[in-house]
Amino acid sequence: MTTWYRIIAGVTRTFSFKRGPVGCVALAVLFAACSSTMPPPNDEAVIGGGVTRHSLVFIIHGDGDYLYHNTLGEARRADEDILAQAQAIARKLPNAEVTIFHEIARRHVLFLIPRHDGRAFYYRQGKLLGKTSYWRDQGNSRFAPEADLYAKFADAQSTSPVRMFLYFGHELPELNVQGYDASYPDRRVSVGDLAQGLSTFTGAADKFDLVVLGTCFGGTPHTIDALAPYARTIIASPGDLHLSYFDLEPLATLDIKRDDGAVTAFADRFARNAFDRLTRDVQTAVSVVVYDVNATQAFRAAVAEDYDRTLAMANGMPASVSHCDCADDPAYAHSEMSNGLTVLYRAPRFGRMKNDTHHSGWECWNTGEVQHADNPDNAGARP
């Protein structure tokens, strides 16, 4: 039986302390905060002899403003709620490995010693086999720390499991901008960083069967195109998405194979469950879309040049741009617009858009220069 071992997680900073009780206490706190439990790589005596049929990776961004108040007026953090859901799911899956990364704000012990700003949890067959804390500023890319830990955690003996990746956080910028990570205000982040992270998680020869993008405005041609090389199916919202109400419960009974359209059927069920929860709990517009990546390729290719041009314009006039349904812009009125999409949409209960009954499933930028598209034959357009 492989012995569980303790390691001191990568501490890259050194400190000096005065002799005395305060220094000893500070040092003890530092090492207590840095100690981690790593999983035995493939210890059957510990984890049992079950087969890993599903592999789930969660990245939950909590390094920002995720405070909200529930219907009872209680203050809560959306990222902590999603973390609790993910951990509960992990404990219920006997044939899965689940890796959860929680990116948190950097804090200090005794106002001096920086604490790790990332937490990782590894479950296999419903058991928590490992957890560790880590620094999020290590590595040559935004998600390199998570990818490196995943490589250490993952079950190397599993053969072709159904693979899912779920990201929860604020809207991922389409251009490199500062301010996404509160602890790293000067660091530039874009959806391209997530795409690069996915490429590291999947390796050169594989894709995630399902990617869930739990952010606002994730259903844009640019975002789906960036993630497309690493995913077969994507669930995203082209509009606002209330993270605190996103329901993970369908994952608790996950029991599917890659064949016979099972992943697609599960994606539809997962999206419908999230949509039903959102429409029950919020009054604003709700949109959840399932994208069959291969089937959307023709539309993405047809609009890429126009979208990139508009994106560049939007970058130069941030005060005057807003999101809009791509169907409102004639430049995107292509016959392939609806291909590969399952669109779930409900208009807001109030405001000028309360009578809208349809959404194309694609979100674009309005620079104030476009007119509503007159294309009634396009199935993706609003009526």
Q: Model regions: which residues?
A:
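Sec-dependent N-terminal signal peptides
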Residues: 19-27
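C-terminal motif of bacterial Sec signal peptides marking the signal peptidase cleavage site
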Residues: 32-33
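Short non-domain terminal segments
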Residues: 13-15, 29, 297
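Terminal, contiguous helix-loop blocks that mediate binding/assembly
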Residues: 41-80, 84-103, 109-383
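N-terminal secretory signal peptides that target proteins for export/translocation
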Residues: 1-18
